[in-house]
Amino acid sequence: MLKSILLVGVGSFIGGVLRYALSVLMRGICGPGFPWGTLIVNLAGCFAFGVIFALFGKYGSTNSGWCLLLTTGVCGGFTTFSTFVHESMQMLQNGNPGGFVAYVATSLVAGFLLLALGYMIFK
C-alpha cells in the first residue's frame, strides 16, 4: 500500500508540474480570455490515460505499479477537474454563458472521445 501511495504521489507531482507549465505557456500564447491551458491538459490527459491503460492491458498489467504511476499519478496530477469547474463558474459569473457552454461541452464530449480513441488505437 505504501508503495502505491508513493507511486501516485510521485506521478501527481510530475503531472502537476507539467499542467502548470502548459497552462502558463498557453496563457502567454493565447491570453487570459479563455482557459486554453486547462482545456488542453484535460483533453491530452484523457487521451494519454486511454493510451496508457490500453498498452498496459495489452502488454503488461493494468494493476502494475507503472500503470498506477502513469494513470492515477501523472494523468491525475496533469488533469484538473476542480480547476475546470472553477473556470466554468467564473465564465458564468463574468457574463459569458456562450464561453461556459462551449468550454463545458468541449471538455466533456472531446474528453470522452479522446479517451476512447486513445484506448482503441493502442489496445
Segments and roles (model prediction):
Residues 1-123:
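Membrane-interface helix-loop junctions in multi-pass transporters/channels
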